[in-house]
């Protein structure tokens, strides 16, 4: 990852785009498919890089920034449930200094001189849920979903042992929130049953719990050993108690399971002592935990602290360090991605780390192999922090056998056998054979039909692979003629292995439904390198319609200077991305394919649907000491109203709020003729907005 301190604005824009796309994909895999693609530590590293970039370049914050979201958009198979109070995730602390910073932020934000009591509890590695009771009767159970809208799992939640269906002496409306999990031994027993029945084993207890809870058939859920803890009261918690410790006492009296392992800390030392106790004893607990949650105990203080886009200010999760294991590197295989990138993968002697059997690990790129001096038959150290695909940290050179084998970077593509062109300095190695490469063609089709692109449900990885292998599709266009081909064929798809009449009918219905698509989705679906959802939206906004888009892209092929300059001037489209766009449309087959798709699809013109307010997208700078509110509280209010708060004044600044002893920033704002107001005017402004 690049050094944030040295990065240019153009590089930052590109990196923010890439991070938004990556994190969105990882969120979808984790929250919706229950199938994590990267380790917790890798995810946290990406997310923190995104935050640091946004802090340095606040004017570059994207509409689809990961810092504004939690979870992922829910799937379509369950009814939707809107949370009255968003179910947000927690910010992370990775060491004692991060925790001290969290405590200091509370003191500064609330202008406290003394330590405010912090409630500490284990962070259960399970699936978050909400349960709503009306007149004491359980009426709705829901998953977190994207934090704002979850999935209705009422029937499934009722099958969990000891989960109250009816409670007495509670308000007319009650919400509880908590975590559903599977204990370690139950997980091992469940996987043994899966294996005996010839079914796939679950990767870890969290996946097993999530998969069990998200069953359409609640009788399957009833057979799974699910357990739960409640830890908050959602929209109604402050009607029940005035603090977190009082709330849990009340919920326990109502018959809910609460985690008895907790601590009300009155100092930082007590916080760290509880953390060390749990870290030391985590392996002895019957369930998996991946850290400790700290939250302000006093609800009135929580209210004053409020929230940022994806997490509360009054709480944080102190993560445990990764679990380290050692195993043997058996071989290195190579995967070819959608844009031709070759990625090495370590095939390992299976090892159990933290209750999960691991047999593969990503190596990211070929320089990583050389840098760590990895050789086949080496004994390697693995890091796992909630991982499914963990990270190789290094080699145990003391145990290196005499017969190890070095890995040679391939000279030819492992999929199409075309020659690879690269230099020893290249970090990324790509196959340039495009759609003539079977692996790239397969991945491009997978991307085209994916949720955030054409959204063709029923065309998952296995189905696409099957249709290609059988010769039923070979490119994007073939998808829309699949029904016609099936109708005229003697070998019907519904009679083939893995298919049935209903699944085929649904597939054809979903393909037909996908023919109505927005311009941003269509552009994203094309799979142009570095054109993620945000850049696709930029292009759609610029060109407005499909006809104009394709016409302008054809002009780009003729080296038309006006269109080149127009693209270059788009915020977010730098030189490198522009080269990727040109390379894509330089391929005649790509233009022809897009034109044919344009004849089949109804590609809707771009429409700006975002609601605007007086402060939306305005860049605001606070300077000096504000008389009645803290700087942090003022910043939080501005961001809540859609403004972007910057640390310095520039020609892009829209508004400066000046307090007492405002210095150089105020002077610069006057020089640039930027609007300046005081705290009283600011409070009036936000009240009117």
Swiss-Prot record:
<comment type="function">
    <text>DNA ligase that catalyzes the formation of phosphodiester linkages between 5'-phosphoryl and 3'-hydroxyl groups in double-stranded DNA using NAD as a coenzyme and as the energy source for the reaction. It is essential for DNA replication and repair of damaged DNA.</text>
</comment>
<dbReference type="InterPro" id="IPR004150">
    <property type="entry name" value="NAD_DNA_ligase_OB"/>
</dbReference>
<dbReference type="InterPro" id="IPR010994">
    <property type="entry name" value="RuvA_2-like"/>
</dbReference>
<keyword id="KW-0862">Zinc</keyword>
<dbReference type="InterPro" id="IPR041663">
    <property type="entry name" value="DisA/LigA_HHH"/>
</dbReference>
<protein>
    <recommendedName>
        <fullName>DNA ligase</fullName>
        <ecNumber>6.5.1.2</ecNumber>
    </recommendedName>
</protein>
<feature type="active site" description="N6-AMP-lysine intermediate">
    <location>
        <position position="123"/>
    </location>
</feature>
<dbReference type="GO" id="GO:0046872">
    <property type="term" value="F:metal ion binding"/>
</dbReference>
<dbReference type="GO" id="GO:0005829">
    <property type="term" value="C:cytosol"/>
</dbReference>
<dbReference type="InterPro" id="IPR001679">
    <property type="entry name" value="DNA_ligase"/>
</dbReference>
<keyword id="KW-0227">DNA damage</keyword>
<dbReference type="Pfam" id="PF00533">
    <property type="entry name" value="BRCT"/>
</dbReference>
<dbReference type="GO" id="GO:0006281">
    <property type="term" value="P:DNA repair"/>
</dbReference>
<feature type="domain" description="BRCT">
    <location>
        <begin position="610"/>
        <end position="689"/>
    </location>
</feature>
<keyword id="KW-0520">NAD</keyword>
<keyword id="KW-0460">Magnesium</keyword>
<feature type="binding site">
    <location>
        <position position="431"/>
    </location>
    <ligand>
        <name>Zn(2+)</name>
    </ligand>
</feature>
<dbReference type="InterPro" id="IPR033136">
    <property type="entry name" value="DNA_ligase_CS"/>
</dbReference>
<dbReference type="Pfam" id="PF12826">
    <property type="entry name" value="HHH_2"/>
</dbReference>
<feature type="binding site">
    <location>
        <begin position="89"/>
        <end position="90"/>
    </location>
    <ligand>
        <name>NAD(+)</name>
    </ligand>
</feature>
<feature type="binding site">
    <location>
        <position position="121"/>
    </location>
    <ligand>
        <name>NAD(+)</name>
    </ligand>
</feature>
<dbReference type="Pfam" id="PF01653">
    <property type="entry name" value="DNA_ligase_aden"/>
</dbReference>
<feature type="binding site">
    <location>
        <position position="437"/>
    </location>
    <ligand>
        <name>Zn(2+)</name>
    </ligand>
</feature>
<feature type="binding site">
    <location>
        <begin position="40"/>
        <end position="44"/>
    </location>
    <ligand>
        <name>NAD(+)</name>
    </ligand>
</feature>
<dbReference type="InterPro" id="IPR036420">
    <property type="entry name" value="BRCT_dom_sf"/>
</dbReference>
<feature type="binding site">
    <location>
        <position position="295"/>
    </location>
    <ligand>
        <name>NAD(+)</name>
    </ligand>
</feature>
<keyword id="KW-0464">Manganese</keyword>
<feature type="binding site">
    <location>
        <position position="416"/>
    </location>
    <ligand>
        <name>Zn(2+)</name>
    </ligand>
</feature>
<keyword id="KW-0235">DNA replication</keyword>
<feature type="binding site">
    <location>
        <position position="413"/>
    </location>
    <ligand>
        <name>Zn(2+)</name>
    </ligand>
</feature>
<dbReference type="GO" id="GO:0006260">
    <property type="term" value="P:DNA replication"/>
</dbReference>
<dbReference type="InterPro" id="IPR013839">
    <property type="entry name" value="DNAligase_adenylation"/>
</dbReference>
<dbReference type="Pfam" id="PF03120">
    <property type="entry name" value="DNA_ligase_OB"/>
</dbReference>
<dbReference type="InterPro" id="IPR001357">
    <property type="entry name" value="BRCT_dom"/>
</dbReference>
<dbReference type="InterPro" id="IPR012340">
    <property type="entry name" value="NA-bd_OB-fold"/>
</dbReference>
<feature type="binding site">
    <location>
        <position position="179"/>
    </location>
    <ligand>
        <name>NAD(+)</name>
    </ligand>
</feature>
<keyword id="KW-0436">Ligase</keyword>
<keyword id="KW-0234">DNA repair</keyword>
<feature type="binding site">
    <location>
        <position position="144"/>
    </location>
    <ligand>
        <name>NAD(+)</name>
    </ligand>
</feature>
<comment type="similarity">
    <text>Belongs to the NAD-dependent DNA ligase family. LigA subfamily.</text>
</comment>
<feature type="binding site">
    <location>
        <position position="319"/>
    </location>
    <ligand>
        <name>NAD(+)</name>
    </ligand>
</feature>
<dbReference type="InterPro" id="IPR018239">
    <property type="entry name" value="DNA_ligase_AS"/>
</dbReference>
